[in-house]
């Protein structure tokens, strides 16, 4: 099987940030949460907040929007940002593993692309994390939880934080924009 990271790997950008800006343009009153979001980020940078708590502060706005409708509109407009090199080589057995929230990626990954998704589990009604952020070693744990006997043929990511998954793959690739290079020194 082939495994791909999502943001900056097969998607041109950060889907969470793009979604936030998309929502903010349509619901400008949500700017009221910006101080909380900035505070959460600063507390994370100083080691006071966990990554999960910082992201909960960021996603506080989802409680105040029609989430399904907004994600649907967002992906109608933004699925064009899925990179063409991925669409050309996509296989039904692919797995997308991402730190982005499941509520955001599910419709585009499972619906539009028709492949499996492992993502950060977030309660869509509260913005609270269910378990750990799907990042680094947690991606490996979540992969083996869902697919205990999987063999990774090819792995693609834009980030060295995905080295734990890259080490498990027969072939690993670093993606920079549309340039795909063999992952060295794993």
Predicted segments, located by residue:
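Generic structural signal for well-ordered secondary structure
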Residues: 12-13, 51, 98, 136
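Short low-complexity stretches enriched in small and charged residues
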Residues: 13-17, 48-55, 71-77, 109
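Active-site-proximal helix-loop elements at catalytic-domain edges
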Residues: 67
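Short, flexible segments with low predicted structural confidence
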Residues: 25, 29, 57-59, 114-115, ...
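Short, compositionally biased "basic patch" segments
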Residues: 34-60, 112, 116-117
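Active-site neighborhood of HAD-like aspartate-dependent phosphohydrolases
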Residues: 1-46
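C-terminal cap/substrate-recognition subdomain and adjoining C-terminal extension
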Residues: 70, 74-186
């Amino acid at each position: 099987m082939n495994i791909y990271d999502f943001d900056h790997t097969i998607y041109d950008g950060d889907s969470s940030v793009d979604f936030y800006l998309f929502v903010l343009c349509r619901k400008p009153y949500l700017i009221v949460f910006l101080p909380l979001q900035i505070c959460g980020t600063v507390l994370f940078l100083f080691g006071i907040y966990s990554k999960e708590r910082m992201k909960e502060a960021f996603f506080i706005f989802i409680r105040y929007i029609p989430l399904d409708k907004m994600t649907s509109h967002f992906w109608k407009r933004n699925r064009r940002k899925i990179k063409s090199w991925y669409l050309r080589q996509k296989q039904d057995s692919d797995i997308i593993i991402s730190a982005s929230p499941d509520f955001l990626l599910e419709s585009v990954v499972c619906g539009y692309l028709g492949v499996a998704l492992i993502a950060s589990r977030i309660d869509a009604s509260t913005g609270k994390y269910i378990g750990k952020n799907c990042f680094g070693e947690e991606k490996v744990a979540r992969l083996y939880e869902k697919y205990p006997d999987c063999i990774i043929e090819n792995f693609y990511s834009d980030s060295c934080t995905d080295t734990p998954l890259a080490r498990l793959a027969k072939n690993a690739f670093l993606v920079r924009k549309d340039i795909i290079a063999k992952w060295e020194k794993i």
